[in-house]
Design a protein with these regions (language model features):
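Nucleotide-activated donor-dependent transferases that construct or modify glycoconjugates
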Residues: 2-18
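Structural motif
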Residues: 4, 92-93, 131
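Histidine-anchored nucleotide/phosphate-binding helix
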Residues: 19-36
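Conserved nucleotide-sugar phosphate-binding/catalytic loop shared by glycosyltransferases and other
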Residues: 34-83
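Generic beta-sheet signal
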Residues: 70, 119-121, 135
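Short N-terminal targeting/anchoring amphipathic segment
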Residues: 86-100
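Short beta-strand/loop segments at the ligand-binding rim of alpha/beta enzyme cores
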Residues: 109-118
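A nucleotide-sugar donor-handling region in carbohydrate enzymes
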Residues: 128-152
Length: 152
């Protein structure tokens, strides 16, 4: 099945990740729907389900969004397996909500004709994403694709 928008985010009880990434992604997905931009059936979430990351699945089940969950090895950030999964399921727009995306990873998605948006990404991948949004990190160097500050 093909989706129009694919969110790639996690949630967990982990030192480096809490629930902010998936909370923001759910907020965006709900706004796409409430503003009649998308239907729920057009949205897919990809998330990890290993120990420490099971909160993502719980949030998505509660909100009744379609999702696929994978092991940490399969969706390890910036891995070729993660890229393959996204390219197989992902729609026209891929939304990545995480901190350290690599350029090579973004390239592997964009070469398949997909648009990529990143949120609060400190990795060099944000430099080549179609849109980078940084509401939290205001000290990131400005670029033409970056929107930063609390307005975003």
């Amino acid at each position: 099945m093909s989706f129009k928008v694919c969110f790639r985010c996690d949630a967990g009880i982990h030192p480096e990740i809490g629930t902010g990434h998936i909370t923001r992604s759910l907020f965006l997905a709900k706004n796409f729907i409430s503003n009649n931009m998308l239907k729920k059936k057009d949205i897919l979430f990809l998330t990890r389900n290993d120990k420490g990351f099971k909160l993502g699945k719980k949030y998505l089940e509660k909100e009744n969004f379609k999702f696929k969950y994978y092991s940490n090895n399969e969706l390890s950030p910036n891995s070729s397996s993660e890229s393959k999964i996204i390219n197989n399921f992902g729609g026209n727009l891929i939304i990545l909500d995480r901190l350290k995306t690599k350029k090579s990873f973004i390239k592997s998605i964009k070469q398949n004709g997909k648009k990529v948006v990143t949120f609060d990404d400190l990795g060099d991948g944000r430099e080549i994403s179609d849109l980078a949004v940084s509401a939290i990190f205001s000290d990131i160097e400005q670029s033409k694709n970056l929107k930063k500050g609390l307005n975003y």
